[in-house]
């Protein structure tokens, strides 16, 4: 599905839902949803959801959501406004591409990559593997990843204001920043791999918080297993 130069509101659903090996691409759109899903217990209440239902009506594969020069809003009038994440990915492999797109939501939860209660896939084996690419993009909000899910977050000329994987629950959580990107750290965060074109780490605004990384992962060899004091008194340090 490709949509350009459009404005719309859905008062009984999410902004967009992708099932299986399908894609949605938005350009210069202004879309609003109520973040209302159909799963039990509200597990799929989200602004945008990428998933695989296993019902047979969509091929297995990568689900891709892309938006450029657009605005995505969870309506403040929705009963889900204060609780629903902007993005939820479950039981699938997914890609989210955002370029110069405004996100408006009230929960403080940017992204949840996680399994579900068994409605889609087998509970305990229905996590997600997500690649999230941000280009000229402002991102703000909590990022959570559960023990059966992975996230690769790539920032290009973008800003991230977030606590990432605060429970240290993610199976793998990788963050990559180019030299023109900034991570404003709002709380203790755990990453598997940290890649930064700015090897001085000056583009990480730590606010006194701690970032833990996996010193046994060869992709972190440039950090030499060290504890590094960041500019605002926080540290980047190996996880125990």
What are these regions (language model features)?
Residues 174-178, 182-239:
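Extracellular, surface-exposed repeat/solenoid domains
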Residues 1-12, 17-38, 43-79, 87-106, ...:
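Surface-exposed loop/turn motifs in large extracellular/passenger domains
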């Amino acid at each position: 599905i490709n949509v350009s130069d459009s404005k719309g509101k859905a008062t009984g659903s999410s902004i967009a839902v992708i099932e299986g090996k399908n894609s949605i691409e938005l350009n210069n759109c202004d879309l609003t949803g109520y973040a209302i899903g159909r799963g039990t217990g509200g597990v799929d209440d989200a602004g945008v959801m990428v998933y695989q239902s296993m019902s047979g009506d969509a091929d297995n594969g990568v689900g891709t959501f892309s938006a450029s020069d657009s605005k995505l809003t969870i309506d403040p009038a929705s009963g889900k406004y204060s609780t629903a994440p902007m993005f939820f990915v479950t039981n699938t492999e997914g890609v989210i591409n955002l370029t110069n797109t405004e996100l408006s939501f009230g929960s403080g939860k940017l992204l949840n990559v996680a399994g579900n209660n068994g409605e889609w896939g087998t509970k305990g084996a229905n996590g997600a593997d997500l690649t999230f690419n941000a280009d000229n993009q402002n991102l703000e909000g909590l990022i959570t990843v559960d023990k059966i899910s992975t996230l690769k977050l790539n920032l290009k000329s973008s800003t991230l204001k977030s606590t990432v994987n605060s429970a240290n629950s993610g199976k793998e959580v990788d963050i990559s920043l180019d030299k023109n990107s900034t991570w404003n750290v709002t709380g203790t965060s755990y990453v598997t791999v940290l890649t930064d074109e700015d090897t001085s780490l000056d583009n990480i605004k730590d606010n006194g918080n701690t970032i833990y990384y996996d010193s046994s992962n060869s992709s972190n060899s440039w950090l030499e297993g060290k504890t590094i004091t960041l500019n605002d008194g926080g540290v980047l340090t190996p996880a125990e």
